[in-house]
Regions:
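Amphipathic, small/basic residue-rich leader segments at the start of a protein or domain
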Residues: 1-69, 86-97
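Buried hydrophobic positions in well-ordered alpha/beta secondary-structure cores of metabolic enzymes
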Residues: 2, 31, 38, 54, ...
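Short glycine/proline-enriched turns and hinge-like loops at secondary-structure junctions
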Residues: 46-47, 114-116, 140-145, 158-162, ...
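Glycine-rich beta->alpha junctions and the first turn(s) of the following alpha-helix
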Residues: 60, 165, 175-233
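Glycine-rich phosphate/pyrophosphate-binding beta-alpha loops
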Residues: 60, 112, 136-142, 222-226
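N-terminal glycine-rich flavin-associated loop
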Residues: 63-86, 112-115
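A short, Trp-centered hydrophobic/proline-enriched beta-strand micro-motif
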Residues: 98-106
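A short core secondary-structure module
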Residues: 119, 128, 132-178
Length: 233
């Protein structure tokens, strides 16, 4: 699949700056997106080495297209572990089928990727959380159907203990995005996301408030090995 289907269109996709979602769906149909997830979420319960081999081989054909399995595995680990079962099932079965992509929004203009030093605010308002602030350098920010957002629910002095995570559908009112003019990796794209009084259902909270730092670290523990294999490919 990597050599026959992914490699031939690499330059055309990069020049167009557009992700080929039909090719992503092909990948999903072959079971090559987040196979380490449980079968209930569309995976096959495979091990880390299996998932890593997929990323390495896809990256050998097209480094940028390898973001498809990489981002799926990173977000999949977090959603499978912390989202409500019905929400995880809804999003992850579509993700593993290649119907959608997901992004992860941690990095901010002032604090970088310091997960304990976030400025984006998330406040409870009845059955919703209201998000205000900016994320930047987010991969797939304009093509993702949803984004796992890490935001501050506690006081700034709470540090890591005041960070929470929530799954945000990207079609909600109040969300705007921009795309960086990159030298490469144009298929997936990178850019900023602004949240202006974005109302997200409270049921989309991942786990408990104040547990976001531990959640993102758990996701990164898995994805770091995949990033290394992406570079190796």
């Amino acid at each position: 699949f990597a050599q026959d289907r992914v490699a031939p269109g690499y330059l055309a996709r990069e020049k167009a700056g557009r992700m080929d979602m039909a090719l992503v769906r092909e990948m999903g149909q072959l079971g090559l997106i987040a196979p380490e997830l449980p079968e209930a979420f569309g995976g096959m319960g495979a091990g880390t080495l299996y998932a890593g081999a997929i990323v390495e081989e896809i990256a050998r054909a097209d480094f940028t297209f390898a973001y498809v399995p990489l981002l799926a595995s990173l977000n999949g680990q977090i959603l499978a572990a912390f989202a409500r079962p019905e929400i995880a099932r809804d999003w992850l079965t579509r993700l593993t089928a290649g119907e959608i992509m997901l992004a992860i929004a941690l990095t901010e203009p002032k604090g970088g990727s310091d997960a304990a030093n976030l400025g984006l605010r998330m406040e409870r308002d009845g059955a919703h959380y209201i998000l205000n602030g900016e994320k930047t350098s987010i991969s797939a920010n304009q093509i993702a159907a949803g984004t796992v957002v890490f935001a501050r629910t506690g006081r700034p002095e709470d540090g890591a203990r005041g960070v929470s995570a929530i799954l945000v559908p990207m079609d909600l009112p109040g969300i705007t995005t921009s795309k960086f003019d990159n030298m490469g990796q144009n298929q997936v794209g990178h850019g900023s996301i602004w949240f202006d009084n974005v109302r997200v259902p409270a049921e989309n909270l991942l786990g408990d408030e104040g547990r976001g730092f531990a959640q993102v670290m758990q996701g990164f523990d898995f994805s770091r090995s995949l990033i290394g294999l992406q570079c190796l490919g």
